[in-house]
Amino acid sequence: MWRRSRADPAAEAAWAGFLRFAKALDEGSRALLATVPSARRPGAPLAASVAGFLAGLDAARAELPAWDHPALADAQAATVAALDAAERRARDLPATADGLEFEHRNERVADVLDELEPVQAAERAARALRRQPLRAGGRQTRQGR
């Protein structure tokens, strides 16, 4: 019978930390998306949505140390840069979106969220790290041998 090698505890801890980071970032992103009206609701005021997004960024930044791992250093650096860029755009959003029509305002909101694309690469890196077995070589072992 074949079994998987044990997972690296440091990789598992980094993954758990990344999940907390992602949850905080998702909540902030949802706050910003709440400004976009739908058929059932008019959309939240832009200033409140931006404030919610910035709060989500702050909460996500607080979780960065939780997924600190040498194998994720590059991904984490790219993520920090992405958070900074998204914050700059979000802070400028009320001024740049003032007076814009619906579609153009939504494009500006999308521009803010597009800055977070490196977070997807960080997630892939964290998942890949988690899949690496604790044993060197990454081979499966035969149970009982």
Regions found by a protein language model. Name each.
Residues R6, A10-R145:
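Long, low-complexity or tandemly repetitive, helically biased scaffold regions used
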